[in-house]
Amino acid sequence: MAEVQRYALVTGANKGIGFEICRQLAEKGIIVILTSRNEKRGLEARQKLLKELNVSENRLVFHQLDVTDLASVAAVAVFIKSKFGKLDILVNNAGVSGVEMVGDVSVFNEYIEADFKALQALEAGAKEEPPFKPKANGEMIEKFEGAKDCVVTNYYGPKRLTQALIPLLQLSPSPRIVNVSSSFGSLLLLWNEWAKGVLGDEDRLTEERVDEVVEVFLKDIKEGKLEESQWPPHFAAERVSKAALNAYTKIAAKKYPSFRINAICPGYAKTDITFHAGPLSVAEAAQVPVKLALLPDGGPSGCFFPRDKALALY
């Protein structure tokens, strides 16, 4: 009996981890819909990948997609329905950091490494995140506009795209949704006790309550009240948006029990966002979302997996 053809959509796929996710899924025989906000870059990425994989053009298609634009989201759903009739795998990979850099950009990676160490300390029982002062002569600035873009791209975007594609995923015998998140979405790094309480209360968790946390955060940063309201001192929008995405992952998994829906941290990789620092290549980072995208039936759902735990699943 012939194997049923599977179709996957990957967001933010014209470069970096998203591009490598497309490559690895295509190598598994899956027809991949490579999407990106910028049409020119997306088409160029498709041609590059087709050449590198040496496969027929119908194995990899491109469609413009801006996850922050409702019309763009609706258009890609119509495209998939008309061309393929269903969707098997959705990888919500597109994301932004929400910060502006001034001076030496290596300060960005100092903060990332400090946050990883802080999370390890908190997981080991530390009462609070240790203070950190970077050595590099640079500054990381978080403004309302960047924070809003971060929240819309990292949380609202994946949520709205997922909701738009649910009817097509329901036509798959083994629907999979992978939300590319971050360990920085850990509630241990969220600081604000009210937000931690809301997002950590799984029995009462709803989309409306998650949205409320996000909107209160945006209101506070707009009014210059981040410190007063006890939000994180840096990567605030990144932490809040990824914590919200992790919470939505649990909600969606509970609502659609036949799906396998999980969030993952791919690890600290050399991408444009990290100014190409980090120990992992984008190919290594992509292994994690691909692993979750190909999760066997009966696998876990509604979970967040750090890189090491995801790789050990099967």
From Swiss-Prot:
Highest taxon listed in the record's lineage? Eukaryota
- Record-annotated disulphide pairs: none
Keyword set for this entry?
A: Cytoplasm, NADP, Oxidoreductase
The chemistry this enzyme catalyses reads: (2R,5R)-isopulegone + NADP(+) = (6R)-isopiperitenone + NADPH + H(+)
Q: Which residues form the signal peptide?
A: none
Could you tell me one molecular function GO term of this UniProt entry? (-)-isopiperitenone reductase activity
Give the pathway listed in the UniProt entry for this protein. Answer: Secondary metabolite biosynthesis; terpenoid biosynthesis
Please state the Enzyme Commission number of this protein: 1.3.1.82
What does the UniProt entry say about where the protein is found? Cytoplasm
The UniProt similarity line reads: Belongs to the short-chain dehydrogenases/reductases (SDR) family.
Q: What is the protein name given in its UniProt record?
A: (-)-isopiperitenone reductase
